[in-house]
Design a protein with these regions (language model features):
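Beta1/beta-strand and adjacent pyrophosphate-binding region of the FAD-binding site
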Residues: 16-27, 45
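Glycine-rich loop(s) and the adjacent beta-strand/alpha-helix scaffold that form part
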Residues: 180-229
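A conserved short coil-to-beta-strand element within the FAD-binding core of flavoproteins
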Residues: 149-162
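Extreme N-terminal leader/targeting segments of oxidoreductases
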Residues: 1-19
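Single conserved hydrophobic/aromatic residue that forms the stacking wall/gate
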Residues: 236-247
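N-terminal Rossmann-fold NAD(P) dinucleotide-binding loop
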Residues: 30
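Conserved N-terminal/central alpha/beta ligand/cofactor-binding core
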Residues: 55, 61-146, 151-152, 203-210
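Short hydrophobic core segments
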Residues: 22-24, 153, 173-183
Length: 247
């Protein structure tokens, strides 16, 4: 773990007995929401349909080796979200998200290298990210919160037009205000919301394309190019609001 004096430390106090808030999803949105709730003196109860980040890795291997997919534990669902087993790059192309220093410092507090605080293109790394995610979960639990795996939200509890909690596939209900951090693959959640007249709003999407090249060609471009090394990320503006990114 990095030393405390190498990053800005956030204090997470014990929130046992405090009002609870239900967080649906243990991806980056859900984990950071839970940590922020603790900062505000509220008790997070995180409900995740998939498995913890270590157990989930076995299900990902099963996809590659046996071509069998667990619908609740895969690349989309499980602790850490869809990016848990990507290469751990941290960046945003949005100009509207404000300062991200707090986010980077929280990552460092939970085991990420402090190099991400100064690197132009911060990168945690696939090998280190699961441990960072586990440490975030441990912070939530040690502060009095809860994390429930293999627990899928099946419905909101709505009384007189107000959300009072959630029902789950285990038969257990959780009461309190609800934060939905389900990710874009939880189509069953969005179908339920639409069918039950809960206001939802569509947002723009990003479609990525990965091109594979011979290693020799990439070496030539990156290390033997008289014009210098290619940029890590470049943007080509074709027409607004469309934006094309080349990585």
């Amino acid at each position: 773990m990095p030393k405390d004096d190498e990053y800005e430390h956030t204090i997470y106090n014990n929130v046992e007995g405090k009002p609870q808030v239900i967080v649906v999803g243990a991806g980056p949105g859900g984990l950071f929401a839970a940590l922020r709730l603790i900062e505000l003196g509220l008790r997070p109860v995180v409900v995740e349909r998939g498995k913890d980040v270590r157990e989930r890795k076995k299900d990902l291997a099963q996809i590659s080796r046996e071509h069998r997919v667990d619908p609740e534990s895969n690349y989309s669902f499980g602790e850490g979200g869809a990016g848990a087993y990507s290469d751990g790059k941290l960046y945003t192309r949005s100009k509207k998200r404000g300062n991200v220093d707090k986010i980077l410092n929280v990552f460092c507090q939970h085991g990420a290298s402090t190099a991400i605080l100064v690197d132009a293109h911060p990168h945690i790394g696939t090998d280190k990210l699961p441990r960072v995610i586990e440490n975030m979960r441990n912070t939530i639990i040690e502060c009095g919160g809860e994390v429930h795996f293999k627990t899928r939200m099946d419905a909101l509890i709505i009384e007189q037009g107000e959300v009072k909690g959630i029902e789950t596939n285990t038969g257990e209900t959780f009461l309190g205000p609800v934060i939905l951090a389900t990710g874009h693959s939880a189509r069953d959640v969005y179908r339920w919301l639409a069918a039950n007249n809960v206001t939802i709003e569509a947002k723009g999407i990003a479609v990525g394309v990965r091109l594979e090249h011979p290693a020799g060609l990439i070496d030539q471009i990156q290390y033997h190019n008289r014009s210098g090394r290619g940029k890590y990320l470049s943007l080509i503006h074709i027409s607004e609001p469309t934006r094309h990114s080349l990585i």
